[in-house]
Amino acid sequence: MRAVPLPAPLLPLLLLALLAAPAARASRAESVSAPWPEPERESRPPPGPGPGNTTRFGSGAAGGSGSSSSNSSGDALVTRISILLRDLPTLKAAVIVAFAFTTLLIACLLLRVFRSGKRLKKTRKYDIITTPAERVEMAPLNEEDDEDEDSTVFDIKYR
């Protein structure tokens, strides 16, 4: 049950398709529907003390410098949120691609660790496999029983 790796040229094409599909869909949806309206900066009264700020926040006192700074930060927050909502399909595709890449990387690393563990067990069991032939000297352990050639056990000495 071995996973078949994707051919090298197919992986970048797959990633490109994942990135391009939501972006193309979003651009088609934007071209069909009306363009996103810009934040209503022209219809709002300028920040500062005046009746516009008092009715907007629902407070009876005239707005001072504190309320004007909260207006500008609120406008900036609305602008940032609207930009994020406009680019939501692209952000979603980017997160999906990053998640897929991370998952693939973790799976490859786990597979590599698992396979190297099998190799280490074989190396410990049959140490002669990984040792160069020039460094191995084999001598029979049971020299007194020379009639049984099949059951001779060898001692490995490293030089």
UniProtKB/Swiss-Prot annotation:
Intracellular or extracellular location(s): Cell membrane; Golgi apparatus
Main location: membrane
Listed GO biological process terms: Golgi organization
Glycosylated position list: 53
Keyword Transmembrane helix: yes
Pfam families listed in its UniProt record: DUF1180
Ranges of the Cytoplasmic topological domain: 112-159
Keyword annotations from UniProtKB, A to Z: Cell membrane, Glycoprotein, Golgi apparatus, Membrane, Signal, Transmembrane, Transmembrane helix
Induction line: Up-regulated by Golgi stress-inducing agent nigericin.
Membrane topology, as annotated: Single-pass type I membrane protein
Domain of life: Eukaryota
Annotated signal sequence range: 1-26
InterPro entries listed in its UniProt record: FAM174-like
Transmembrane segments: 91-111
GO cellular component assignments: Golgi apparatus; plasma membrane
Intervals, Extracellular compartment: 27-90
Residue ranges of the region described as Disordered: 30-74
Family statement: Belongs to the FAM174 family.
Main function: Essential for Golgi structural integrity.
Name recorded for this polypeptide: Membrane protein FAM174B
Gene: FAM174B
